[in-house]
C-alpha cells in the first residue's frame, strides 16, 4: 500500500484523496517518506501493521528535521517524542481520545501526523501554523498550550466532564520532567488521585532527572504491572483485605507497596499522590511502548502515570550532542547542523541586562540574580558565570521565585528577579501579597516585553504595564534603547524602599553608544529627545525609534514635533505630561502594551489636573488592540496594529481631523 501510493504521481495521489487537494506538494519531498506519505490523519496510521511503525517513526523524524531546518522553531523536544507520538496515535483513538501536550514544544511530529503536514513549513510564520498546540487549528489539539505545567489540570477537567456526560473515551496528558518542577502539576495530581478519576499521565523524562536506567527488566515489569492479570489480582487482594482484621490488611498493603517500590522506586511519589505508576520504559523502543500503552489504555479505574524516558534531539547527531543549543533553533543546514544566525548589529537586550548586573554586582555583594528556568533567555547565565553563588535558577516556579526574592529582600539583599513578561503573570499574587504590600525592594527585570513575534499570543508581553501599574508604591520603567537599560539597572540597585521593575523587549538594541557604567536616573522623570511646537509624541519603551521616524515625516508635512521619552510609567512625570499638553495641539502616547497601561495613566493625570477641560489639546493613546494577536514577525505585528511610524503619523492626522492619504498625495 505504502509503496504503491508513494510511487504514483503526485496528481494521482491527490485525486485519490480529495481532502488533500490543498497540500503544498512543491515544498515537501515526499519521495523520501513513502509510508508517511500515506498518512493524512491518525486513522490512516492505525491501518498500518505494527511492524511498519518503525519506518513511520524514522520518516516522521526525517520530516521534522527537514521542516524545522526551513522554519526554525523548537526542535530537540520534538525529536525526542517521535516514537511516543507515533505509538500514542496508533494505540489511542484520537481525536475521540483527548491528547494534551504540555507546553507544546514537542508537538511538531504530532502536527505532521494530524493533517497538518502540508503546512508544517509555515510554522511560526504569519498566517501559518502555531508553534504550539492550538484549539482553533485542529480537532487534534483539544487544549492550547505554551506555558508549562497546565496539561494535567486540563486533562482532569476533561476526564471529569467525560464522566459526568457518561462518556468512555480516554484522556491523555503528556508532560515533561521539567514541567514537573511547577507546583500546578502536583496540585492537579493530588486532586486527580483524590478523585480517583480515570486519567492517563505520560511523564516524558528527557533530562534523566527522575528515571533510573531503563532496559529489558524495566520493560518487562512495566508490561507486568500494567497488564490485566496483575491488576485483577491486585484488586482482588484489596477486596479480600476489606474482610480481614485491620492490622493484617494494613500489613499486607504495605508489603505490596514495598515490593513494587523495591522494583520501581521512582514511582513512590506518584503512588503517594494516588496514581498507579508504570515504568520507566524506553520511549524510543516501540516494542516496549506499544504493549504498555495498550495495557494502560485498557485500564478501567483510577489515574495512571506512565514514566517514559526519552532523549532530546534523538536521531539528529548535532542535537543529541548539544541539547541546549538545539532546544530552539533558527534555520539550519541539515547536513552540518550549522544555524543561519546573522551577525547582530547591536547587543541583545538580555545580554545588556546580564552584563549591567555583573558590573553592579562587582561593586555590591548584596546583589542576587534569580531566574525561573530561563537563564540564557534572561541573561542571568552571564551573571552566573561571574557570580555562581549569587545566582539561583528555581526551575519553572515563578510563584516561588517572587516570594523567594521577597525573603532575600527582608534580609537586606538586593534580588533581581529576571522573568519574561508573559511568565511573570504566573506570580502575580506573590507580587501583590508578598512584595508590594510589604514594600519590599525586589527588582523585576521584565524581559520579552511587548510583542515577541513567532511565539504569538501565548508569549506576548502585553499586560505587565497594566497589571503592575495598578499597584501602589511600585517604580516601573521601560527602556527606550540598550543604553537606557544600563542606567535603569543602576537605578534599580539604588531603590531600597520599594519594589521596582524595568521592561525591555526581545532581540537586539538600536546600536546606540553604550555607557561605561550605569548612572541612577532621577525617579519619575522623563526626558525631551527632540523639541517641537505643534505635536507631542510621548513614548514609553522602544517605540521611541518609531516616534523619531514619524516626527521626520510629520516635519515634511510642516508639523513641528516634540518627542519625549517617559522613562517611568510610575511614578509618572506629571510636570512633563502637563507641559506637553499645555504647549502642543496634539499629544499622542505610544507604548508596547495593552489598554490600562501607560496611556491610561497619562489620561488619568490629565483629567485630574483639568488639562482636558478646555479642549485645547487633542489627546490619543496608542496601545495594543484589545485582542490576542497571532504570530508573525514583531515588525509585521506592530505595523498591523498601527504601532509603527506610519501608524503614528496616521494617528496624528486623525487627531487633527485630516486624511493622511490626502495629505501625503499633496506632499508628493
UniProtKB/Swiss-Prot annotation:
It catalyses: D-glyceraldehyde 3-phosphate + pyruvate + H(+) = 1-deoxy-D-xylulose 5-phosphate + CO2. One of its GO terms (biological process) is thiamine biosynthetic process. SUPFAM superfamilies: Thiamin diphosphate-binding fold (THDP-binding), TK C-terminal domain-like. Its EC number is 2.2.1.7. It comes from Nitrobacter hamburgensis (strain DSM 10229 / NCIMB 13809 / X14). Keywords: Isoprene biosynthesis, Magnesium, Metal-binding, Thiamine biosynthesis, Thiamine pyrophosphate, Transferase. Disulfide bonds: none annotated. The keyword Metal-binding applies. Homodimer. Its cofactor is Mg(2+); thiamine diphosphate. Belongs to the transketolase family. DXPS subfamily. Binds 1 Mg(2+) ion per subunit. Catalyzes the acyloin condensation reaction between C atoms 2 and 3 of pyruvate and glyceraldehyde 3-phosphate to yield 1-deoxy-D-xylulose-5-phosphate (DXP). This is 1-deoxy-D-xylulose-5-phosphate synthase. Pathway: Metabolic intermediate biosynthesis; 1-deoxy-D-xylulose 5-phosphate biosynthesis; 1-deoxy-D-xylulose 5-phosphate from D-glyceraldehyde 3-phosphate and pyruvate: step 1/1. It is an enzyme of class 2 (transferase). The gene is dxs.
Amino acid at each position: 500500500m505504502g509503496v504503491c501510493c508513494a510511487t504514483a504521481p503526485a496528481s494521482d495521489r491527490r485525486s485519490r484523496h480529495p481532502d488533500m487537494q490543498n497540500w503544498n506538494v512543491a515544498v515537501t519531498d515526499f519521495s523520501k517518506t513513502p509510508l508517511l506519505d500515506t498518512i493524512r490523519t491518525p486513522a490512516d496510521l492505525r491501518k498500518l501493521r505494527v511492524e511498519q511503525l518503525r519506518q513511520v517513526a524514522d520518516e516522521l523524524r526525517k520530516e521534522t528535521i527537514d521542516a524545522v531546518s526551513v522554519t526554525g522553531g523548537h526542535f530537540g523536544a520534538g525529536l525526542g517524542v517521535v516514537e511516543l507520538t507515533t505509538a500514542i496515535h496508533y494505540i489511542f483513538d484520537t481525536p475521540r481520545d483527548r491528547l494534551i501536550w504540555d507546553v507544546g514544544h514537542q508537538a511538531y511530529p504530532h502536527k505532521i501526523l494530524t493533517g497538518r503536514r502540508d503546512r508544517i513549513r509555515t510554522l511560526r510564520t504569519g498566517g501559518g501554523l502555531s508553534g504550539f498546540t492550538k484549539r482553533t487549528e485542529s480537532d487534534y489539539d483539544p487544549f492550547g498550550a505554551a506555558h508549562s505545567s497546565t496539561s494535567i489540570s486540563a486533562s482532569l477537567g476533561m476526564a471529569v466532564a467525560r464522566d459526568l456526560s457518561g462518556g468512555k473515551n480516554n484522556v491523555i496528558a503528556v508532560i515533561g520532567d521539567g514541567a514537573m518542577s511547577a507546583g500546578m502539576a502536583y496540585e492537579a495530581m493530588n486532586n486527580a488521585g483524590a478523585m480517583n478519576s480515570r486519567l492517563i499521565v505520560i511523564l516524558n523524562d528527557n533530562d534523566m532527572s527522575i528515571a533510573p536506567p531503563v532496559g529489558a527488566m524495566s520493560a518487562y515489569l512495566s508490561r507486568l504491572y500494567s497488564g490485566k492479570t496483575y491488576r485483577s489480582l491486585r484488586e482482588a487482594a484489596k477486596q479480600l483485605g476489606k474482610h480481614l482484621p485491620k492490622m493484617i490488611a494494613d500489613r499486607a498493603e504495605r508489603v505490596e507497596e514495598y515490593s513494587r517500590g523495591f522494583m520501581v522506586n521512582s514511582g513512590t511519589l506518584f503512588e503517594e499522590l494516588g496514581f498507579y505508576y508504570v515504568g520507566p520504559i524506553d520511549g524510543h523502543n516501540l516494542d516496549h511502548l506499544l504493549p504498555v500503552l495498550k495495557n494502560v489504555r485498557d485500564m478501567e479505574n483510577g489515574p495512571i502515570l506512565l514514566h517514559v524516558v526519552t532523549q532530546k534531539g534523538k536521531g539528529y547527531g548535532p542535537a543529541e550532542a548539544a541539547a541546549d543549543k538545539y532546544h530552539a533553533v533558527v534555520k539550519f543546514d541539515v547536513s552540518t547542523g550549522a544555524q543561519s544566525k546573522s551577525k547582530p548589529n547591536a547587543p541583545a537586550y538580555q545580554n545588556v541586562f546580564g552584563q549591567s548586573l555583573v558590573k553592579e554586582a562587582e561593586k555590591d555583594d548584596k546583589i542576587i540574580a534569580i531566574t525561573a528556568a530561563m537563564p540564557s533567555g534572561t541573561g542571568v547565565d552571564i551573571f552566573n558565570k561571574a557570580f555562581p553563588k549569587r545566582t539561583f535558577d528555581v526551575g519553572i516556579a515563578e510563584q516561588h521565585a517572587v516570594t523567594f526574592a521577597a525573603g532575600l529582600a527582608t534580609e537586606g539583599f538586593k534580588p533581581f528577579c529576571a522573568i519574561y513578561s508573559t511568565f511573570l503573570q504566573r506570580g502575580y499574587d506573590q507580587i501583590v501579597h508578598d512584595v508590594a504590600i510589604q514594600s519590599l525592594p525586589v527588582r523585576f527585570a521584565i524581559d520579552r516585553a511587548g510583542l515577541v513575534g513567532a511565539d504569538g499570543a501565548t508569549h506576548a508581553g502585553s499586560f505587565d504595564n497594566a497589571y503592575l501599574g495598578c499597584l501602589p508604591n511600585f517604580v516601573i520603567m521601560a527602556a527606550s534603547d540598550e543604553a537606557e537599560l544600563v542606567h535603569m539597572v543602576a537605578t534599580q540597585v539604588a531603590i531600597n524602599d520599594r519594589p521596582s521593575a524595568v521592561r525591555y523587549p526581545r532581540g537586539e538594541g538600536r546600536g546606540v553608544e553604550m555607557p561605561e557604567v550605569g548612572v541612577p536616573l532621577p525617579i519619575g522623570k522623563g526626558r525631551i529627545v527632540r523639541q517641537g511646537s505643534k505635536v507631542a509624541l510621548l513614548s514609553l519603551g522602544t517605540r521611541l525609534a518609531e516616534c523619531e521616524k514619524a516626527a521626520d515625516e510629520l516635519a515634511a508635512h510642516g508639523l513641528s514635533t516634540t518627542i519625549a521619552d517617559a522613562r517611568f510609567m510610575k511614578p509618572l512625570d506629571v510636570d512633563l505630561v502637563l507641559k506637553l499638553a499645555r504647549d502642543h495641539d496634539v499629544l499622542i502616547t505610544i507604548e508596547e502594551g495593552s489598554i490600562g497601561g501607560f496611556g491610561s495613566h497619562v489620561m488619568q493625570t490629565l483629567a485630574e489636573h483639568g488639562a482636558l477641560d478646555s479642549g485645547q489639546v487633542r489627546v490619543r493613546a496608542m496601545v495594543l488592540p484589545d485582542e490576542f494577536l497571532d504570530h508573525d514577525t514583531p515588525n509585521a505585528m506592530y505595523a498591523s496594529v498601527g504601532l509603527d511610524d506610519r501608524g503614528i503619523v496616521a494617528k496624528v492626522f486623525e487627531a487633527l481631523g485630516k486624511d493622511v492619504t490626502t495629505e501625503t498625495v499633496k506632499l508628493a
